[in-house]
Amino acid sequence: MECELVDLSNNNVGSVELNPLIFSAKQKLSILHDIVRWQLAKRRVGAHKTKGISDVSGTTAKPYGQKRTGRARQGSLRSPQFRGGGIIFGPVVRSHAYSLNKKVRKFGLKIALSLKYLNNQVVVLDSLNVDVKKTSKMCEYIKNFKFSSFLIVGDYGDDLLRAAKNLHYVDLIKPIGLNVFDILNHECVMLTKDTLKHLEGRLL
C-alpha cells in the first residue's frame, strides 16, 4: 500500500509504504464502540458523593422510648426518613474503569486507522521539524489541508506545541499516546514516517 509523503505545506516529497495489516483491517464498528466506551469510562473522575447515615452530623441517641408513645418506633434521628438524615444507597467516590482485552484494544486501533485511510483522511508527513513559533504560522500550514480538524501524531518540539495550543481544531499527540477516541474525534489524522515505524512495532 503506497501513500503520498508530504510536508506541512502539503508539497509532495516522495512516497511511503503503509502496512496493510494496520491500514486495511476488517471493519468491525462494534469493537470501536466498545473501546470508546472503555476510554470514556476510564477518564471519568467518579467524585460524586452523598452523605450516608454514618456521615451526617447528629446525635446517636434513640429519640424516644420504644413503647408507650403511640408513634412508630425510631432508633436514630439520622435515618433517611428524617429531615437532615442520611441518603441510602447514594453515589460514592469510585472508579468507573473496567478492563478490556489488550488484543481487542490493538485490533480497535487498526480498525480506526483503516477507517480513516479508507475515507482518504490519513496524511503522512516527512517530519515535524519545522520552525513554527507563532499560531498564525501554524494556521498557514494547516490551511494547506482541506479538513476541519486535525490530529497530528509524532515527536514534536515545544515550539510547535505552543503554536498549535490555541487552535481548537488541532491536537498534537505523541505516538505512544495514539488512541481510538482521538482518531475518531478528528477528521484528519497526520502521521510522521517515524510514527509509522512505531505503530508497526506496537501493533504487529
Swiss-Prot record:
Gene Ontology annotations for the cellular component aspect, listed alphabetically: ribonucleoprotein complex; ribosome
InterPro entries referenced in this protein's UniProt entry, alphabetically: Ribosomal_uL4, Ribosomal_uL4-like, Ribosomal_uL4_dom_sf
Coiled-coil features, chain-numbered ranges: none
Region (Disordered): 56-79
GO biological process: translation
The organism's place on the tree of life at top rank: Bacteria
Key word rRNA-binding present: yes
Keyword annotations: Ribonucleoprotein, Ribosomal protein, RNA-binding, rRNA-binding
UniProt GO molecular function: rRNA binding; structural constituent of ribosome
NCBIfam families (alphabetical): rplD_bact
Function comment: One of the primary rRNA binding proteins, this protein initially binds near the 5'-end of the 23S rRNA. It is important during the early stages of 50S assembly. It makes multiple contacts with different domains of the 23S rRNA in the assembled 50S subunit and ribosome.
Family: Belongs to the universal ribosomal protein uL4 family.
Subunit structure: Part of the 50S ribosomal subunit.
Matching HAMAP family: Ribosomal_uL4_B
Name the UniProt record assigns to this protein: Large ribosomal subunit protein uL4
Record gene name: rplD
